[in-house]
């Protein structure tokens, strides 16, 4: 549950101010545990490689899921090669990943009381799925199977089990104006990333019927999708275009001039939640894009957040930035936004994939088009 809240309702936007947790883990120690998940399920995790031979794409997919009880060691936050790439990009201390403790155990059996609804998790540009671990573990503990695809060349790095790597490279005209870049990024989202989503969904159907581990555990009649930044754009497009997806969440997703207008009509006619920073919410065009729906649509501005606050990034950087002392205040602010994001997303999917009550989500503005 989220802490006490006060809010004021503007014509379209809800500004929601949530209180800080009464106590936060101290990041000035040698390491720290990621925030404790809200749900009651133990968590498991495993990684699979999906080969799309028709398109010549190998996709590294990490899955978090409700697990059977057990006492085995928890999974590493990320592998060393991925951590080294992220440390170079974000100027983090070497081997920072060794000091971050997760809650998921690798390769453990899935809980027997399924099948469980599925949530696809889409990363932003030049990052990796592991920086959404707080969100993924929270959803898994609440009874969802989370499926996070690493999309080359949009991800910072993909490290495959056989050791080969794929690195980020721009897929837009770097020297072009903002509109031209936006159109190119929108086309990539629609033609590559959404196609990846469809392929992964197809593979999940096969895994649910043939694969020994997953067989019968995935409820593929209840599928949602959540994405951040470019992944948020992907989530919006996939929710709109893919009939198997029932509900979607966009975490401060990219909307460059012309991106969506030149690719697909924008309105999403399904339940949709948009969490935005104040910077992204400054213009009302973004609000009109996402509230132009005939279904339950939520548009929430998280005050004080920046674009990376919806990930684990600020938790990590406040503790492990190279050559700087840990910043406890920054850590607490990051903890607030991270747990707020997780709680709202969990309640949204509980409401629209499980028909559960959502007391905190219902505090924010809901737009119902009649």
Question: Which sequence ranges carry the predicted segments?
Answer:
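Primarily recognizes the serine-hydrolase "nucleophile elbow" in alpha/beta-hydrolase
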Residues: 199-266
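Bacterial N-terminal signal peptides
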Residues: 8-18
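Alpha/beta-hydrolase active-site loop
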Residues: 159-217
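Active-site machinery of serine-nucleophile hydrolases
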Residues: 64-68, 82-87, 91, 130-178, ...
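Domain-level recognition of soluble alpha/beta enzyme cores
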Residues: 25-119, 330-334
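The feature captures the conserved acid-bearing segment of alpha/beta-hydrolase catalytic domains
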Residues: 246-308
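Alpha/beta-hydrolase-fold serine-hydrolase catalytic core, especially in secreted/extracellular enzymes
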Residues: 26-40, 44-45, 51-53, 58, ...
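Short substrate-entry loop that stabilizes the transition state in hydrolases
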Residues: 101-116, 121-159, 257, 280-282
């Amino acid at each position: 549950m989220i802490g006490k809240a006060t809010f004021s309702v503007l014509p379209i936007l809800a500004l929601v101010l949530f209180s800080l947790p009464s106590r936060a883990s101290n990041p000035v120690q040698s390491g720290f545990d990621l925030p404790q998940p809200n749900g009651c399920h133990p968590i498991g995790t495993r990684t699979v490689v999906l080969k799309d031979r028709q398109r010549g794409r190998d996709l590294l997919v990490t899955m978090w899921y409700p697990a059977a009880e057990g006492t085995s060691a928890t999974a590493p936050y990320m592998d060393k090669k991925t951590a080294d790439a992220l440390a170079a990009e974000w100027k983090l201390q070497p081997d920072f990943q060794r000091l971050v403790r997760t809650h998921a155990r690798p390769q453990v059996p899935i809980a027997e009381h399924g099948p469980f609804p599925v949530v696809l998790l889409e990363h932003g540009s030049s990052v990796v799925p592991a920086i959404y671990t707080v969100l993924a573990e929270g959803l898994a503990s609440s009874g969802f199977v989370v499926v996070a695809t690493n999309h080359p060349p949009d991800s910072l790095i993909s490290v495959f089990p056989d050791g080969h790597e794929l690195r980020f490279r721009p897929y837009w005209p770097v020297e072009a104006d903002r509109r031209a870049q936006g159109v190119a990024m929108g086309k990539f989202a629609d033609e590559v990333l959404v196609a990846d989503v469809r392929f992964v969904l197809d593979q999940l159907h096969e895994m649910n019927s043939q694969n020994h581990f997953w067989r019968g555990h995935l409820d593929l009649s209840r599928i949602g999708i959540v994405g951040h930044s470019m992944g948020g754009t992907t989530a919006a497009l996939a929710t709109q275009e893919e009939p198997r997806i029932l509900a979607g969440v966009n975490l401060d997703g990219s909307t460059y001039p012309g991106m969506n207008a030149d690719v697909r009509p924008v309105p999403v006619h399904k339940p949709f939640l948009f969490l935005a920073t104040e910077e992204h919410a400054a213009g009302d065009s973004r609000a009109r894009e996402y509230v132009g729906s005939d279904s339950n649509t939520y548009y929430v501005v998280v005050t004080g957040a920046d674009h990376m606050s919806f990930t684990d990034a600020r938790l990590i950087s406040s503790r492990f930035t190279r050559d700087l002392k840990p910043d406890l205040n920054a850590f607490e602010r990051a903890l607030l936004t991270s747990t707020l994001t997780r709680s709202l997303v969990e309640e949204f999917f509980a409401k629209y994939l499980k028909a559960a009550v959502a007391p905190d989500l219902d505090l924010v503005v809901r737009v119902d088009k009649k």
